[in-house]
Every structure is written in structure tokens, then in C-alpha cells.
């Protein structure tokens, strides 16, 4: 516990809360260009090949974004839109790539939760 004199000499500093998605800079989404598209393996109890992309954003940040859904058409130099939202079993992946926006196609043959995957309504 500091004394009154110590507090007068050095007042308490308010700790700033750490942001979960700093690269978005308070925006809901950001546009970027894929610099690398690859697969990676998840943390311990899970096993898969998760599709991710390294994205250089318009504000200069370079982030890793998860590509949701089955199958994708992304490659290097694809222009994508990212949103916040981490992937729990992939360390360092704090963003999601939006499907059906810019160069990213929606998921084929998707019947339910279509809006999340940019799929059009089936006829």
C-alpha cells in the first residue's frame, strides 16, 4: 500500500484495456489482399487441416484470417473482407474472412445458415 507522499510523487496510472481486434481500428470490417493461403493444424484435443490466409489490410496491418465453410476459391492476391472473431483452437487467428464478398465466393450447396456463408437462396 503506497503512502500519501508516494501517491503525490507518482499518481496511479489507469490501465488501458487490451483490444481483441486491434487491426480493425474500431471498424466493423476491413478490406485486404491475401499474401499467403495455407492450412494449419489446431491445438491439442482437435485434429484437422484448417484453412487460413495471411492478409495485408488497407491500413498496413498483416493479420491471419480464418476461411469458414467447405471449400474456397482464395489464392494469393485475392481481395477479401475480414471481420473480427477468433478461432479458439488456432493460436494467432483473431479474424474471419467474409464469404460471398469481393473475391471470396459463397459456399456451394449450403442450405442452412446461408447468410453466414454468402450462399444464395436455392431455387
Swiss-Prot record:
This is Small ribosomal subunit protein uS12. One of its GO terms (cellular component) is small ribosomal subunit. It comes from Rhodopseudomonas palustris (strain HaA2). Part of the 30S ribosomal subunit. Contacts proteins S8 and S17. May interact with IF1 in the 30S initiation complex. With S4 and S5 plays an important role in translational accuracy. It comes from the Bacteria. Belongs to the universal ribosomal protein uS12 family. Keywords: Methylation, Ribonucleoprotein, Ribosomal protein, RNA-binding, rRNA-binding, tRNA-binding. SUPFAM superfamilies: Nucleic acid-binding proteins (SSF50249). The keyword Ribosomal protein applies. GO terms for molecular function: rRNA binding; structural constituent of ribosome; tRNA binding. Transmembrane segments: none annotated. The modification 3-methylthioaspartic acid is found at residue 89. InterPro entries: NA-bd_OB-fold, Ribosomal_uS12, Ribosomal_uS12_bac. GO terms for biological process: translation. It holds the Pfam family Ribosom_S12_S23.
Amino acid at each position: 500500500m503506497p503512502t500519501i507522499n508516494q501517491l503525490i510523487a507518482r499518481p496511479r496510472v489507469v490501465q488501458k484495456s487490451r483490444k481483441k481486434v486491434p487491426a480493425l481500428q474500431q471498424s466493423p470490417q476491413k478490406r485486404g489482399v491475401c499474401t499467403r493461403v495455407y492450412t494449419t493444424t489446431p491445438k491439442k484435443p482437435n485434429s484437422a487441416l484448417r484453412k487460413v490466409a495471411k492478409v495485408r489490410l488497407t491500413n498496413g496491418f498483416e493479420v491471419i484470417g480464418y476461411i469458414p465453410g467447405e471449400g474456397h476459391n482464395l489464392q494469393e492476391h485475392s481481395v477479401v473482407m475480414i471481420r473480427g472473431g477468433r478461432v479458439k483452437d488456432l493460436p494467432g487467428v483473431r479474424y474471419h474472412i467474409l464469404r460471398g464478398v469481393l473475391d471470396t465466393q459463397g459456399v456451394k450447396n449450403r442450405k442452412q445458415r446461408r447468410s453466414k456463408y454468402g450462399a444464395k437462396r436455392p431455387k
